[in-house]
């Protein structure tokens, strides 16, 4: 009986809540809707808050409250994890209120929303690049902001995502090998460019390992007149690699490479 009574009480509260929300939707009092929207927002009922704010946004257009409504609409979409829409609303806020009271938050969230929305490294990375650009603008404008540390952290992760994409590309070229051309050379170029463009990325050993492998394969498959030069080049790369990564998980394999290299260089 107690359990049934509790369920009935919950049902009554739910129906009352729904009835109140439906009444608010029909209300002609913008102030009542605004205050209710803030209450729903604080209760994390973002869809209800967003709906009410959308309904009154045109009424308050051009007023001081319009700024608050735009900021809260962006927050509502953020709360719903609708990052693309949140980005658009925060961007709209920055355009309309570049020095507004929510400007610091809005500039940060333009980057953060796109950071949250950035796809897997195998996919197109335009959103990732947009997020980096937004964070760059943010830290230039607000270097002392409480959000600055998080912006730098997330920007570093975004750069790593771009580097990971280049790692996938370099690995793909390596796997293609000599199919329809010298893909080992392409692998080497992509890996070197990634190290240049993303000098602090966390995949540096992986890139350097691919470079060494690519050089080694080009040596092995080289015509005789180029083999000695390529062997010496690969040997230099070997020493660079083991100097930088003496405890690399690839050390045994690199040492086997050196044996084959020395058969050519006669050293």
Please give the residue ranges for each predicted region.
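Acidic, polar-rich low-complexity tracts and alpha-helical solenoid repeat scaffolds
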Residues: 2-6, 14-267
């Amino acid at each position: 009986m107690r359990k049934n009574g509790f369920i009935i009480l919950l049902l009554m509260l739910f129906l009352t809540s729904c009835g109140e929300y439906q009444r608010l939707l029909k209300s002609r009092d913008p102030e009542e809707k605004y205050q209710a929207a803030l209450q729903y927002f604080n209760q994390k009922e973002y869809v209800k808050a967003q709906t009410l704010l959308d309904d009154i946004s045109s009424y308050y257009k051009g007023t001081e409250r319009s700024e608050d409504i735009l900021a809260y609409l962006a927050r509502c979409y953020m709360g719903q994890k609708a990052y693309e829409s949140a980005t658009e609303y925060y961007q709209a806020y920055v355009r309309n209120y570049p020095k507004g009271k929510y400007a610091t938050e809005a500039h940060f969230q333009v980057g953060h929303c796109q950071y949250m929305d950035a796809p897997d490294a195998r996919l197109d990375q335009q959103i990732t690049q947009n997020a980096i650009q937004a964070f760059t603008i943010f830290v230039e404008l607000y270097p002392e902001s409480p959000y600055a540390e998080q912006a730098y952290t997330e920007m570093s992760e975004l750069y790593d995502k771009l580097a990971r994409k280049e790692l996938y590309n370099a690995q793909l070229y390596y796997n293609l090998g000599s199919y329809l051309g010298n893909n080992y050379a392409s692998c080497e170029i992509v890996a070197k460019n990634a190290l240049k463009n993303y000098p602090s990325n966390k995949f540096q050993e992986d890139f350097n390992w691919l470079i060494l492998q690519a050089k080694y394969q080009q040596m092995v498959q080289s015509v005789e007149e180029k083999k000695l030069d390529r062997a010496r080049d690969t040997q230099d790369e070997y020493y660079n690699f083991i100097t930088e990564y003496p405890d690399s998980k690839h050390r045994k394999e690199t040492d086997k490479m050196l044996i084959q290299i020395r058969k050519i260089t006669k050293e």
